[in-house]
């Protein structure tokens, strides 16, 4: 099956085409341009380079949040427009889950962190079991120190990734008592290839929605842990 994937949930803009277990093309830009300037030209370039007939895709996978309010709405509007025009289903992928999928089969806990300002992060905690990504703690918004306290209580090694790493690197080093590491540059930000790969899995599990049904996840929809 063939999935077109979009991620504009953060500073990074990314577009990809995934066919079953093959990443056909991926275009990712992490630069000071707005997604309204980059996303559609990137999509157009991928379509041209791969000679893709958009009518042949089976679904559109899109990072549904959390993340940048404006970025999410640009990605959502693009995906919804394509879904309506092509009469194709959408597959909404949690942003932090797609980030965790970048670190396929890594040992220990995986903790994507996206800077939500005011010492808060959008995050979730994951691990791999039998080559499958498992959720340890659901997607949530939480203070960075509270997150680090959770991880200390779990007592396991953890790998961090996401745009929150450069913001909170020092406090992680200061407060965390368990072994930790940071993902390398090529895996540390949003990638539409991961969104597309998860989109294939979700589609096969029947986890699709219509363009009319799709809504990005905002901060108010996230779980706030009890203090």
For the regions a protein language model found, what residue spans apply to each?
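N-terminal beta-alpha supersecondary unit
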Residues: 1-64, 189
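Short glycine-aspartate micro-motif
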Residues: 3-5, 61, 71, 110-113
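Conserved hydrophobic/aromatic positions in well-ordered beta-strands
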Residues: 16, 122-126, 217
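Surface "functional belts" at beta-alpha junctions
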Residues: 22, 89-188
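DPxDG-like acidic metal-binding loop motif
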Residues: 61-90, 95
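Glycine-rich phosphate-binding/hydrolytic loop that grips phosphoryl groups
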Residues: 184-218
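Conserved small/polar residues in nucleotide/adenosyl-binding loops
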Residues: 220-226
């Amino acid at each position: 099956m063939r999935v077109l994937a979009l991620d504009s949930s953060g500073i990074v803009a990314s577009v990809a085409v995934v066919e079953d277990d093959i990443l056909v093309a991926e275009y990712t830009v992490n630069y000071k341009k707005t997604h309204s300037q980059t996303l559609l030209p990137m999509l157009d370039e991928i379509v041209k380079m791969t000679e893709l007939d958009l009518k042949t895709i089976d679904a559109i996978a899109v990072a549904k949040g959390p993340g940048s309010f404006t970025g999410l709405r640009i990605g959502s509007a693009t995906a919804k427009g394509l879904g309506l025009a092509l009469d194709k289903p959408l597959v909404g992928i949690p942003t932090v889950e797609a980030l965790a999928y970048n670190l396929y089969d890594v040992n220990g806990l995986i903790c994507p962190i996206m800077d939500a300002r005011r010492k808060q992060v959008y995050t979730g905690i994951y691990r791999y079991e039998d080559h499958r990504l498992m959720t340890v703690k659901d997607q949530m918004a939480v203070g960075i120190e509270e997150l680090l306290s959770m991880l200390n209580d779990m007592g396991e090694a953890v790998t961090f990734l996401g745009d929150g790493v450069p913001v909170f690197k020092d406090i992680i080093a200061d407060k965390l008592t368990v072994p930790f590491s940071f993902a390398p540059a090529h895996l540390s930000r949003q990638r539409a290839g991961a969104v597309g790969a998860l989109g294939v899995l979700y589609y096969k599990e029947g986890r699709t929605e219509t363009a009319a049904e799709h809504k990005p996840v905002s901060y108010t929809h996230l779980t706030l842990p009890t203090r």
